[in-house]
């Protein structure tokens, strides 16, 4: 069956090129890094490791102040530069971590931070699929790591990728199972699948292709799932050696906050009660935007901040605000909220923690149709958390936080409006305070999960 997949990957090669071209046209690919989809460019031996993207107005600069490491800054026409390093020699061990998108990328950073304490000489390669994840990594990736886009899942490109990098250990996070890269990767090094989950939709699909699923999964030396429900799904698919340690997202560090920006923002907001709508999709905004005028009519000291999951949608969101008679400004237009507006749209990466810091209540997006996003990030900031009816990608976390009276689940727009009105009502101040305190307690109580993960991973480290 794996051979059949390999053959199909050859037959469909022209289709892959078309898909990549379409993704380029709609802005989902970075033309400056498109070669990485075909495993062209960086490699492990004698390579310049891409450590960080930054903006350098000086054009070209070489810093040889430190003997161990020399850095090269290359100014690109699009104002993006690659900070490259000769820090790592071929002899150093390389741990390859695949993180599909934003949520997994945050987990990968937690793993890097803690694995390097166990193995100080290890260096890291992070692969991901989305532009959004790459932009986040450009500001957060440590010097001991580099990022590359995962190549197309075709045997030619995957073999070239693995030949270039020669990883000593591979760690796949959550649910993205590319048959070719996993099958070929297992020929080069041990592979681990951590924080694994299977959505209900994927489970139904894999039940029809159980033997193929088993062929893919057998390449992993260890499988750690994130919930009892996921363990049962793996068992039903014929995988009996998976283990459940819980969701490693509990161990993700609190989002960083620039204290100078926070002081400035807090002073500017002047004690307004802030409601943040975080990681929103169009389906969320269809519910959120119609209720804002009603909410602000009753609570004049309430200020709305919306942080879309994909900031490139900002023009569309601004247009939708106009359609609902809402005054809105984007962060790219004004660095501080316009207090006379109805809504402020944050179309910048890396500032979620800043706005959670000033929030009283946070609604977590993707929870109407996308299965929900990470609700723990807001919990670290002691926000009262609200989410929609679809938390299928975070079932156990949603169940746990609800059981601890640390969040509220709503069904629709009317339910959301009534919940916000209730929480903002001065008579319910103690109730709101309890939700906020319980959210922080919930996330702090579960942080020991990381130690259990590291205990399992440690024997596999090079």
UniProtKB/Swiss-Prot annotation:
Task: Give residue numbers for the site Transition state stabilizer.
Answer: 174, 249
What's in the GO CC field? Answer: plasma membrane
Stretch forming the signal peptide:
none
Which UniProt key words apply to this protein? Answer: Cell inner membrane, Cell membrane, Lipopolysaccharide biosynthesis, Membrane, Signal-anchor, Transferase, Transmembrane, Transmembrane helix
Listed pathway(s): Bacterial outer membrane biogenesis; LPS core biosynthesis
Instruction: Indicate how the chain sits in the lipid bilayer.
Output: Single-pass membrane protein
Gene Ontology molecular-function annotations:
Kdo transferase activity
The UniProt annotation places CMP binding at 308-309, 349-351, 374-377
UniProt xrefs under Gene3D superfamilies: 3-Deoxy-D-manno-octulosonic-acid transferase, N-terminal domain, Glycogen Phosphorylase B
Locate the active site: 104 (proton acceptor)
Stretches assigned to the RPE1 insert domain: 47-90
Q: Does the keyword Cell inner membrane apply?
A: yes
Reaction(s) this enzyme catalyzes, per UniProt = lipid IVA (E. coli) + CMP-3-deoxy-beta-D-manno-octulosonate = alpha-Kdo-(2->6)-lipid IVA (E. coli) + CMP + H(+)
Which Enzyme Commission numbers does its entry carry? 2.4.99.12
One BP annotation, GO = lipid A biosynthetic process
Places the protein is found: Cell inner membrane
| Disulfide bridge map | none
The transmembrane segments are: 2-22
The organism sits in which domain of life? Bacteria
Primary location group: membrane
Reported function: Involved in lipopolysaccharide (LPS) biosynthesis. Catalyzes the transfer of 3-deoxy-D-manno-octulosonate (Kdo) residue(s) from CMP-Kdo to lipid IV(A), the tetraacyldisaccharide-1,4'-bisphosphate precursor of lipid A.
What does the similarity note say? Belongs to the glycosyltransferase group 1 family.
The protein here is known as: 3-deoxy-D-manno-octulosonic acid transferase
Source organism per UniProt: Rickettsia typhi (strain ATCC VR-144 / Wilmington)
Q: What is the lineage of its organism?
A: Bacteria, Pseudomonadati, Pseudomonadota, Alphaproteobacteria, Rickettsiales
